[in-house]
């Protein structure tokens, strides 16, 4: 199984990324070290995580140990939409800061983190305008080669359809919560039809025991002599979806990477497809945002 997807602009993106939410200091450094050693070449961060510089510093020190350059890894960061009227100025400032933090001349992928700014409510009528201005600012930075690909996160079909009125560059990625108990079939099919890579975050439901102890997946994991986590990640990628798996445990990161080469049988894949409970396990509720 190929280890990369091709985005709509031809850019290659590794199927599995190491997520860095809540990772800082020695924990972040050590898990990045282990991840690089077993083959990870994609790392996911965000302005909101406040760890871009720590990730950049870790990569600067660690990449030479593995005979790698900064261009050999795919880096995603995410930025919330801006409230107010100066989105281009703020986006330019933030992207330049991210480039400095991460030691890059360009960013591989930047996502609009959520369909509203941090400082507005879900039902604020201005959210659509803030999304528009922030997206157009991101398009400008892609045109200026500061960013190779741009996309969204936590966007529903309505949010993407709304973009048709003003975009000149379609989103390359939509990153949302996705796992066997929350399969988002309609959104996933919409993204596939529109050549938007559907990328999962929180694929293990933030460690949700109902998900990880699901008897069907436990049996499949036992058959493959692996963990339920590896089965879930393999199922996601085998369904032609990208995935971000967050951990600060190096051994767990190494175990998760085995999913890149694990192949489920057609029957196993179908059995997991039947486990949808339409149940989100994290607090993000993009579908509630106007």
Locations of the language-model features?
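Short, acidic/polar
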Residues: 23-36, 86-101, 158-160, 182-183
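CE4/NodB-like, metal-dependent polysaccharide N-deacetylase domain
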Residues: 90-112, 140-142
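Acidic-and-aromatic substrate-binding clefts and catalytic sites of carbohydrate-active enzymes
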Residues: 22-26, 46-54, 82-89, 118, ...
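Residues at the N-termini of beta-strands
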Residues: 42, 106-109, 149, 173
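Beta/alpha (TIM)-barrel catalytic core signal, keyed to glycine-rich beta->alpha loops juxtaposed to Asp/Glu
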Residues: 116-290
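Acidic (Asp/Glu)-rich catalytic clusters
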Residues: 7-8, 56-70, 99-104, 164-167, ...
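N-terminal binding-site loop/beta-alpha segment at the start of enzyme catalytic domains
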Residues: 1-73, 204-205, 271, 288-290
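A short, structured active-site edge motif that brings together acidic residues
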Residues: 69-83, 109-113, 178
């Amino acid at each position: 199984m190929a280890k990369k997807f091709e985005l709509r602009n031809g850019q290659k993106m590794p199927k599995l990324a190491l997520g860095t939410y809540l990772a800082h200091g020695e924990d972040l450094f050590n898990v990045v070290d282990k991840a690089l050693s077993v083959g990870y070449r994609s790392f996911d961060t965000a302005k909101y995580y406040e760890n871009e510089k720590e990730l950049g510093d870790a990569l600067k020190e660690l990449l030479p140990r593995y005979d790698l350059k900064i261009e050999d890894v795919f880096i995603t960061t995410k930025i919330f939409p801006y409230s107010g009227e100066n989105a281009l100025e703020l986006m330019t400032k933030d992207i330049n800061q991210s480039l400095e933090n991460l030691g890059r001349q360009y960013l591989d992928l930047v996502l609009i983190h959520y369909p509203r700014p941090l400082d507005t409510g879900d039902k604020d009528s201005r959210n659509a305008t803030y999304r528009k201005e922030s997206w157009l600012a991101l398009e400008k930075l892609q045109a200026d080669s500061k960013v190779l690909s741009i996309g969204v996160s936590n966007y529903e079909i309505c949010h993407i359809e709304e973009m048709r009125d003003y975009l000149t560059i379609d989103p390359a990625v939509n990153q949302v919560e996705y796992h066997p108990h929350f399969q988002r079939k309609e959104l996933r099919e919409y993204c596939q039809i529109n050549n938007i890579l559907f990328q999962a975050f929180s694929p293990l439901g933030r460690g949700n025991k109902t998900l990880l102890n699901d008897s069907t997946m436990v049996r499949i994991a036992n058959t493959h002599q692996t963990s339920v986590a590896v089965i879930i990640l393999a199922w996601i990628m085998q369904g032609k979806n990208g995935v971000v798996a967050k951990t600060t445990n190096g051994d767990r990161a190494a175990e998760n990477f085995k999913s890149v080469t694990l192949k489920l049988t057609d029957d196993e894949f179908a059995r997991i497809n039947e486990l949808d409970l339409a149940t989100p396990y994290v607090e993000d509720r993009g579908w509630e945002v106007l």
